[in-house]
Amino acid sequence: MNMRAMIVGFWLALASLGAQAATYNFVVQPILPPDQTREAFEPLTKYLSQQTGHDIKLVTAINFLTYWETMKKGSQYDLILDAAHLTDYRLQRMNYKVLAKRADVVSYSLVTGENADILEARELIGKSVASIGSPSLGMLRVEEMFPNPLRQPAIVEVNNSIDSIQKVLDGKAIGAMVPTPLVGAYPQLITITTTDQVPHTAISASPRVPADVQNAIRNALVNASNTPAGQKMLEAINFPSFEATSAKTYNGYAKLLEGTWGY
């Protein structure tokens, strides 16, 4: 083969690879502020891009209401990492496919500051409690904990769980409902009660993501703990591992959304 033919073949091969690659938007539920979300999860999207040959682009939402409304439109989020109730919602109503989940389970904790002198959740009726807005799992747990509309705390709605905690530390809220894993980072917080555990967050894919790309992402996630690149990614995002899962794991959790505006 002459040099000209080799060069032509090389560029044709590159063009073929470029034609096969695609860009997919990856969003994470806005539990953290957008800048912290990027810092926390860019190692994951970079890893998936390297492993799949596609451009997995991290996008963020400023708050849960914006996230919820954008998600329901079904046109902007190709890949989503979020909680059990919204994962099940998309599986049931939007034909998403669950690819893998973070290992373990997760709960929420109702916390106060160390000087609040609160011993039971009912003592927060009529008092200020900070939480991300509906339909975050935290807010749904608050509503579940205080079902009587006449005997509820005064909700201080915030954009993310860090803001919830800061409201308590700054004395602008008596309590807050936050993911239990965050509580350990703040020794000033006192846990009043912890909710039932649910399956941990999962990554699900829109019907726009081809089956072969879904499989490539799934394989990259569940095998991450077995490779140096995957182990580095897991350490960077502070996840123990990803594990295989199915729709059955999340079946029924969408019922937590009943009564939510827009459900």
Give the residues covered by each predicted segment:
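A ligand-binding cleft/hinge motif common to bilobed small-molecule-binding domains
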Residues: 81-93, 165-197
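Bacterial N-terminal signal peptides that target proteins for export
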Residues: 1-10
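Bilobed "Venus flytrap"/periplasmic-binding protein-like clamshell domains
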Residues: 22, 26, 31-47, 107-166, ...
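General small-molecule cofactor/ligand-binding pocket signal
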Residues: 57-59, 156, 192-193
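N-terminal signal peptide c-region/cleavage motif recognized by signal peptidases
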Residues: 15-18
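Extracytoplasmic small-molecule ligand-binding "clamshell" domains
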Residues: 22-86
